[in-house]
A protein has these predicted regions:
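A composition-driven signal for long, intrinsically disordered, charge-rich low-complexity tracts
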Residues: 5-11, 263, 284
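Short, Lys/Arg-rich, polar N-terminal cytosolic tail immediately upstream
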Residues: 6-26
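A structural signal for multi-pass alpha-helical bundles of membrane permease subunits
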Residues: 23-315
Length: 315
C-alpha cells in the first residue's frame, strides 16, 4: 500500500481502468453504434449494387457465362438499337405528360380540401389511398376491368354514343391507360400541397381582398408564388419517380402492345431477369441515371427564375 492506494488500484489491474475507458468510448460513440446496422444495410443493399452495376456496364456479362471487359460496347449498342431508343423516347413522353398533369390535379384537389368542408378528413384519406395501392395486383385487375373492350369506361362512353375502344389492345390507347393510372395516384403530392397551403398566412389573402383581388387573382398572385418551393420539390421528386416508373407498365400492360408501354425501367428488368444480360441492363440503368441527374440539375438551375424563397425575416 503506497500513498493510501493499493498497488492494484494504482495500476488498474483489477479492471476498473478498462471499464472506465469502455464507458467513455461508448458514451462518445453511441450514435455511431446506433446507426451501424443502417450503414451495414446501406453498404450491402445500396452501395455495393451501385458500384457493381457501374463496373458491369463496361462488361459483356451474362449470368451463364464469364464476364469479359467490353469497354463502351454496351453503350454503343444502346444508341444503335431502335427498340431501346424507343423505350427512352416513350419514357420522356410519359414523364413530361404525367408530371404536370398530376401536379395540376393534385394542387386543384388540395386547394379545394383546404377549405372547411364537411367530411374533409374522409376525402383526404380517400384521395391518398390510390398512391399507396397503385402498384398492387388488385389495382392491375381493376384497371384492366375498367379499360377492357367490355369494361366500365366503354360502357359509360357508349351511353354518349361513342363506339367501344380497345384501350389495352391499341398502342396509343394502352399508353394513355398507364398515364391515367399514374395521374390517378396523385395522393402524395396532394398531401404536400395541402400542408403548404395551410402555411400561407390569411393576412395576405385579406390584404389582397382589400385591394380588390378576387379568388382567382389571389390564387395566382398570392398562393402560387408562396408555395413555389413546394411546387419545385414536388416537380423534382415526381420527375425522378416517373423516369423510374415500373409498376404501371409491368402489372397492367406488360410493356405492350407493340412495346408502346415499354419504359426504360421495364427494359432494364427484361434485360436483367429475362435475358440475363446484366451488362446491358446495367448500362441502360446508368444511362437513365445520367439523364435523371442532368434533368435534376437543370431544374435546380432554373429555380432561381421562378421559385420564391422568403428571407430570414419571413419577407
Amino acid at each position: 500500500k503506497v500513498g493510501g492506494k493499493t498497488w492494484y488500484s494504482r495500476t488498474g489491474k483489477h479492471g476498473g481502468g478498462d471499464k472506465m475507458k469502455f464507458k467513455e468510448f461508448r458514451k462518445k460513440n453511441v450514435g455511431l453504434l446506433l446507426i451501424l446496422p443502417w450503414w451495414i444495410g446501406f453498404a450491402i443493399f445500396k452501395l455495393y449494387p451501385f458500384i457493381s452495376s457501374l463496373i458491369y456496364s463496361f462488361h459483356d456479362y451474362n449470368l451463364f457465362r464469364t464476364a469479359t471487359f467490353s469497354g463502351l460496347s454496351n453503350y454503343k449498342k444502346i444508341l444503335g438499337d431502335p427498340l431501346i431508343m424507343k423505350a427512352f423516347i416513350q419514357t420522356f413522353k410519359y414523364a413530361f405528360l404525367t408530371v404536370p398533369l398530376e401536379l395540376i390535379f393534385a394542387l386543384f384537389i388540395a386547394y379545394i380540401l383546404n377549405f372547411k368542408i364537411k367530411g374533409v378528413n374522409f376525402f383526404r384519406t380517400a384521395y391518398y389511398i390510390p398512391s399507396i395501392l397503385g402498384g398492387s395486383v388488385s389495382i392491375a385487375v381493376l384497371w384492366r376491368f375498367l379499360f377492357k373492350t367490355e369494361g366500365l369506361v366503354n360502357m359509360i362512353a357508349s351511353r354518349f354514343g361513342i363506339q367501344p375502344f380497345n384501350w389495352l389492345g391499341d398502342p396509343g390507347g394502352a399508353f394513355w391507360v398507364i398515364v391515367f393510372l399514374k395521374i390517378w395516384q396523385f395522393g402524395s403530392p396532394m398531401v404536400i400541397f395541402l400542408a403548404a397551403l395551410k402555411g400561407v398566412s390569411k393576412d395576405l389573402y385579406e390584404a389582397a381582398s382589400i385591394d380588390g383581388a378576387g379568388k382567382w387573382r389571389q390564387f395566382f398572385s398570392v398562393t402560387i408564388p408562396l408555395i413555389t418551393p413546394v411546387i419545385f420539390y414536388n416537380f423534382v421528386t415526381q420527375l425522378c419517380n416517373k423516369f423510374q416508373e415500373f409498376n404501371g407498365p409491368f402489372i397492367v400492360t406488360q410493356g405492350g402492345p407493340l412495346r408502346s408501354t415499354t419504359l426504360v425501367s421495364l427494359l432494364v428488368y427484361n434485360n436483367a431477369f429475362k435475358s440475363y444480360e446484366m451488362g446491358m441492363a446495367s448500362a441502360i440503368a446508368w444511362l437513365l441515371f445520367l439523364i435523371i441527374m442532368t434533368l435534376t440539375g437543370v431544374a435546380f438551375f432554373s429555380q432561381k427564375y421562378w421559385v420564391y424563397y422568403s428571407d430570414e425575416d419571413g419577407r
